Design a protein with these regions (language model features):
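Solvent-exposed, membrane-proximal periplasmic/extracellular interface segments of envelope transport
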Residues: 40-112, 169-190, 211, 560-638, ...
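Extracytoplasmic/periplasmic membrane-proximal domains and adjacent transmembrane bundles
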Residues: 26, 71, 97, 142-319, ...
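Flexible hinge/switch segments at interdomain interfaces of large molecular machines
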Residues: 15-26, 62-68, 102-125, 153-159, ...
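Hydrophobic transmembrane alpha-helices and their membrane-interface caps
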Residues: 8-11, 16-17, 319-388, 445, ...
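Helix-loop junctions and hydrophobic alpha-helical segments within the transmembrane domains
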Residues: 303, 307, 383, 389-416, ...
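Transmembrane helices with small-residue packing motifs
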Residues: 2-39, 91-101, 191, 225, ...
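Signature of alpha-helical transmembrane segments and their immediate interfacial
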Residues: 1-15, 407, 478-539, 927, ...
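Transmembrane alpha-helices and their membrane-interface boundaries in multi-pass membrane transporters
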Residues: 372-386, 408-427, 434-484, 593, ...
């Protein structure tokens, strides 16, 4: 049944790159076209921040105010219900009075998996206007109807509108203003319900249809003049259908295109949504031959690759574990019992994953891959003991029953200690808890299932396959050879190592102080080797994508920025042979270039190596700032490697501090791409009202501001549907006021009395320096300095920045705080170190309960310092960094490496209870337990080798865990066999030494009698 349901549910599990990590965050976006950053901050951002901070559960608020847009990021306390929080935000926003022209705030709940698009679609063709129309009318509506798609944004297209360009001289002659014309257009273009009317026995609905049907209808509209009479719109304005000035340009592999970015809904399955997008585009292209498209990025491609690679590693791990079991056992039946138990256990996990609504992602499959070697541990212990009983003369039934009973306690203890360490990881807060929740559940399911199978299915299979007579004959032959079972199984070449082990064991047992000194020396040596290990939040993951960000000087036009983006693309195409496709989106003062590389298996260089090779080639491009990063999910989760937040009230002071610190940080040898969020200030035209003069003409500030906006930017008066296409009707000036400052000052403003005055009569027009963007944190102004490191050593870089801050004289009321990757790393490391302490406590109490002793767990757990330091020793040897993944591996080791000690100490205790002295019990137990210990270790280690070597694409992140686990397992096994007897003896002697120190009158028992007493709590 387990196999049937496992296969069935395995095919039903959804796939994803990462677990569904819904962070307690939200973003509030508000658009106010034409407003400066200062206006956005004062009129939009500040009121919204005040309202947000009054909502329960809000932890912190940060905002960015830029031209026409306010963006506020909200961080909630953990376990906040985002839907309820969003509802409360809307209630607060409804009570606000934002300025006319500001759009309603849009609230978007955040999810880490939503930070990257689900799909990128490039519509190719010669006519951008036609491509835009195709995108708006056909493609986008079809994609937005897909279940799970949140939005589809369009970049690079050209839209059309009906432009009403007012002639200021002719309009003034009739006493008309742009505002008056806009209001008239709105009033004349409507469909107005009128109610019902009786027509005989029928009731008919009445509506007044005055909608414009064409551009000519708009041009021929009759305007009633304020002074009496009328005039047609075409007599005072040029009315035409035209393409709008494009805000963005997009290009794909050297061709102009319209680029669509598909984002999924929070909680929707990314792989499923991207597959639906791919199928929908294929069906659209089949139905409409005018659709020519490319898919430069599809999330499902990478997800499928990651999942298939992980599954291949799981299968390879199972095969390697089975081979090791066969090499040790040399019995087909015994090997089959082990081999069958592994897939049965994995299929059982698939059933539980479906019940708990987990997905097949890198973390859940990583848990299975890391646990494949562990699931045979219990089976090997039970199997080996059953065969030992059979070799000693027990019949098949008693060998299976009694052999299983003898090791049941140690199997349960080792299983519970292994599972216990995952509880604090899964329950830890922050990113660590969200990231490893699926991992802990799957590996916990796997290990608990392995215990059940080892104590039930394995004895059953042994009973079916065991031939006790053959086992007994094999044992006699081995006895005649006078060789240990391990030697006869693996080969004579290990005989010398085995006898060396026996000599060392005998020496350390009789020289306990030397044994303890050697153990302590190993810890000191390993720790010393690890002191230079770098620390990072997460290891990088090669997704085969490189992101190049271009910033051009203030005031740059789209064409100027596009020319630089073209040059960057050309350099990339010439110097990156691994390039599969390239696309970019260019705006007025910035551009984003994306490089898509070939599959990892088809190239020799990583995406980081490619990015490093491009950096010097692109730094020579003048007139812009360029930053290069390899795009991956872990980078988005980690934040910037260099991130410094400076807060205070005065923006000029913040700018000065940021300039000083940016220069000093940029001078650091390891720092690259260091930029400040203020950069250069933008020259801006400021119109300051003369309220007394304006009042004389009956003008308010709102009327003057609207007149300036209508003249320079224009306003959308209404919309007209022509050929099923909705077009905005935009009323604007003839552009004469935009030619110079003097022209702006001379712009006519309609007065309340029907006359006109120049703008300079009611306002002062001057050029000022203003910030391009204004950032705030918790309602205080903030400037951020960000950058990257060449080496990836965030810890060393942070130390250097702290040294700079220590020597910097910060003005009173201003603070500088390190954030980004380092802050997140410290928080996650703290959570995991706390989880490690809790895990050690759980392991101790589980062992104390199992062995009914307080000292026995101490003996078993004394192996952990050597195991931990030995595990970390492998990181600098393999060029790896200490990351959150490595720390989780250490926590896993806390519950794994003690298993060998449990088996060893439990058997020593059993032999002492049979009357043997301590030394005899140790020297008899260790050789007898070396085979199952070596078998379990080698199966666990070899099963992790594919993951540690990152065999297949996308597995770099889990590779660190495999390396740490393998190193810890190998070193801990060697140390367990040599030093656990030493630890046991030292702890066993403590009561006697304690009694001597207290000078008690109670006579000590004879040495041989004392040695025969096992350690008790």
């Amino acid at each position: 049944m387990v196999v049937i349901f496992g296969v069935m549910y395995a095919t039903q599990l959804q796939m994803a790159l990462m677990p569904d990590m819904e962070m307690p965050m939200a973003v509030v976006m508000t658009t106010y076209v034409g407003a400066t950053p200062s206006d956005i901050e004062e009129l939009v951002t500040r009121p919204l921040e005040t309202a947000i901070m009054s909502v329960p559960g809000v932890d912190s608020v940060s905002s960015t105010s830029s031209d026409g847009v306010s963006q506020i990021q909200i961080t909630y306390v953990e376990d906040t219900n985002l839907d309820i929080a969003a509802s409360k935000l809307r209630e607060k926003f409804d009570m606000l009075s934002l300025p006319d022209g500001a759009m309603d705030p849009i609230i978007v709940n955040m999810n880490i998996s939503d930070l990257m698009p689900t799909a990128m679609i490039a519509l190719m063709g010669d006519d951008l206007a036609e491509l835009q129309e195709l995108a708006e009318d056909v493609v986008v509506p079809a994609l937005e109807r897909i279940d799970g798609v949140a939005s589809v944004s369009i970049n690079g297209g050209v839209t059309e509108q009906i432009t009403v360009e007012v002639d200021p001289t002719r309009a003034a002659g009739f006493g008309l203003s742009n505002s008056y014309i806009s209001q008239f257009l709105t009033a004349e273009n409507l469909l107005y319900p009128g109610g019902d009317v009786q027509n005989g026995s029928k009731t008919l609905t009445v509506s007044t249809d005055a909608k414009f049907q064409s551009v000519e209808d708009v041009a021929n509209m009759i305007i009633s003049l304020p002074t009496g009479g009328s005039v047609r719109l075409r007599e005072v304005a040029d009315v035409r259908l035209e393409a709008t000035e494009s805000d963005t340009l997009a290009m794909m592999n050297g061709e102009d295109c319209v680029l669509l970015q598909v984002s999924k809904q929070s909680g929707a399955n990314e792989e499923e949504v991207s597959n639906k997008v791919e199928k929908r585009m294929a069906s659209l292209a089949a139905e409409n031959r005018s659709i020519n498209y490319a898919l430069p990025y599809l999330a499902s491609d990478f997800i499928d690759l990651a999942v298939s690679s992980a599954l291949q590693n799981i299968i390879l791990g199972v095969v390697l574990a089975a081979i090791v079991a066969f090499l040790f056992l040399r019995r087909f039946g015994a090997t089959m019992a082990i081999a069958v138990s592994m897939p049965v256990c994995i299929l059982a996990v698939f059933v539980l994953m479906n019940i708990f609504d987990l997905t097949l992602n890198m973390m859940s499959l990583g848990g299975i891959a890391m646990g494949v070697g562990m699931i045979v541990d219990n089976s090997i212990v039970v199997l080996e003991n059953i065969y030992r009983f059979a070799a000693e003369g027990h019949d098949r039934m008693s060998a299976c029953v009694d052999g299983t009973k003898e090791v049941t306690t140690s199997v349960i203890a080792s299983t519970l200690t292994t599972v216990a360490v995952f509880i604090p990881i899964g329950l830890s807060g922050g990113m660590a808890g969200m990231l490893f929740d699926d991992f802990c559940l799957t590996i916990g399911f796997l290990i608990l299932g392995s215990m059940a199978i080892a104590l039930t299915l394995v004895p059953l299979l042994c009973y079916m396959m065991l031939d006790e007579n053959k086992v007994r004959q094999d044992q006699i032959k081995k006895a005649e050879k006078k060789q240990n079972a391990l030697v006869s199984t693996v080969g004579g070449w290990i005989s010398k190592l085995y006898h060396l082990y026996l000599r060392l064991l005998d020496y350390f047992v009789h020289h306990l102080k030397i044994g303890m000194l050697v153990a302590v020396g190993l810890v000191v040596f390993f720790v010393g080797c690890c002191l230079t290990t770098n620390m990072v939040l997460l290891p990088s993951m090669d997704m085969g994508q490189i992101s190049i960000s271009i910033s051009t000087p203030i005031g740059s036009q789209v064409d100027e920025t596009t020319a630089i983006a073209d040059r960057v693309a050309a350099i990339a195409q010439e110097n990156v042979p691994e390039l599969e496709s390239i696309y970019y989106v260019s705006e007025a003062e910035s551009a984003s270039v994306a490089l898509i590389l070939t599959d990892k298996s088809d190239r020799d260089r990583s995406s980081d190596d490619v990015a490093d090779s491009l950096r010097p080639l692109l730094q020579d491009i003048a007139g812009c700032e360029i930053t290069i990063t390899s795009s991956d999910m872990t980078a988005l989760m980690s934040g910037d490697e260099i991130s410094l937040d400076i807060t205070g009230d005065d923006y000029e002071t913040l700018t000065m501090i940021a300039a000083d610190l940016t220069g000093q940080i940029s001078a650091l040898e390891d720092a690259v791409d260091v930029t400040s969020s203020v950069a250069d200030q933008v020259p801006q035209v400021k119109v300051t009202m003369n309220r007394e003069a304006a009042a004389q003409y009956g003008l308010t500030a709102a009327q003057v501001g609207a007149a300036v906006r209508d003249e320079l930017t224009g306003s959308t008066a209404t919309s007209v549907t022509i050929n099923n296409k909705e077009l905005d009707v935009v009323v604007k000036g003839d552009g004469s006021a935009t030619e110079s400052l003097d022209a702006l000052r001379s712009m006519s403003v309609a007065t309340a009395m029907g006359g006109y005055v120049p703008l300079s009569s009611v306002a002062n027009v001057e050029v000022v320096q203003a910030p391009q963007t204004i950032t705030r944190s918790n309602q205080s102004r903030q400037v951020s300095i960000t950058g990257s490191t060449l080496s990836g050593d965030v810890t060393a870089m942070t130390a250097s920045i702290n040294a700079i801050l220590d020597n910097y004289s910060m003005p009173e009321g201003y603070t500088a705080t390190i954030s980004g990757s380092y802050e997140e790393m410290m928080e996650s490391f703290t959570d995991l170190l706390l989880a490690l302490v809790v895990a050690l406590g759980l392991v101790y109490f589980v062992l104390a309960a199992q062995f009914e002793s307080f000292l026995m767990p101490v003996i078993i757990m004394m192996i952990l310092p050597v195991a931990f330091s030995g595990a970390l020793f492998a990181l600098p040897l393999t060029g790896r960094d200490l990351s959150m993944i490595s720390l989780v591996a250490l926590i896993m080791l806390a519950g794994t490496v003690v298993n060998n000690s449990i088996v060893l100490v439990d058997y020593i205790k059993t032999r002492r209870e049979m009357g043997e002295s301590r030394e005899d019990a140790i020297l008899h137990a260790c050789p007898l337990r070396i085979r199952p210990i070596m078998m379990t270790t080698l199966t666990t280690v070899l099963a992790m080798v594919p993951m540690a070597m990152a065999m297949g694409d996308t597995l770099e992140m889990m590779s660190d865990m495999g390396i740490t686990m393998i190193s810890g397992m190998i070193i801990s096994t060697i140390v367990t066999l040599l030093f656990t007897p030493v630890f046991y003896s030292v702890i066993d002697d403590l009561p006697r030494h304690f009694r001597r120190r207290k000078h008690t009158d109670t006579p000590e028992p004879p040495a041989d009698e004392a040695a025969a007493l096992p350690v008790e709590g």
